[in-house]
Amino acid sequence: EAPEGKVRSQLTNEWIDEDLYDQRPLAVMYPINKEGMPQYGYDKIDIFYEILEEDGMSRQMAIMKDWKDLDKIGNIRSIRDYFVYAALEYDPIIVHFGGPVVYVKDILTRSDVQNINGVGGELGDSYDAFFRENPDGRASEHTAYTKSELLLKACDTAGFQLNYRDDVFADYKDKSHYQFTEASNKNTLEQYGDKAVPAESLDFSAAYPHDIPTFEYHADDHLYYRSIYGEPQKDGTTGTQLAFENVLVQWTYYEVRDDNGYLAFRMHDKTHDGMFITEGKMIHVTWEKDSDYGPTRYYDDNGDEITLNTGKTM
């Protein structure tokens, strides 16, 4: 039975306030650069992405539904078009600081895509939603931040709807983004027998050699704790380490676009491989996505959609 005034989040299946149910999330672009740490707003993350960009670096995107009470978010960095395609399935308000115009202009300036762009100009207005902080003399690209108050004013000025939009999201807004099990009934992956292999220490340095991301599973709270550069990745305000109930890995086709090293990833596809990691185990999956606003679906080797555990997903 639901606690009074609470409903299940479409993104995590956790209990949230009723007034958050229809609220559009933010999609916030965070850097991975060590010089840009610490970062702020992590505690509100529901779903977190890391995808490569040029020069072997990667970038992070946070999907956060409960975002209206944050005094500091960021630092904020530029976006790539494949992050936009990953974000659209949440009907978000996208928060970023520019991007390579030749590759992101077409998607960011589409009439259905709503973004708040710290650089302003042809990729979208800033709506005066950003500020600079630089107490330790870091490079300027690591000094741009925003906060909830400024974002709310920006949305009002821009005319961005704060609740899910019926014209693009009516088919999805009242459905769970993933298929979830209840928190009291964990999906241990034991039903897959030998196909579920142990996965308590995860090392993604081969895929992301710059920040060397790792995860350590803690059986006591069923969470995978994330580290980068050999240190816990923490929220700059609370000091809480990023941790996730579910880790999803997607493999996909990519190519190098030009001499600057800009990448392209195929974000709409069928039957590409991946991995689902939870409860200290891992199974092979395939994934598919066939529309901008439709969710990415993940299937086990029996062809059944996988069931995620209640909580945050990386």
Specify the residue positions occupied by each region the protein language model found.
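A surface/extracellular/periplasmic glyco- and lipid-processing/surface-interacting theme
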Residues: 2-49, 54-314
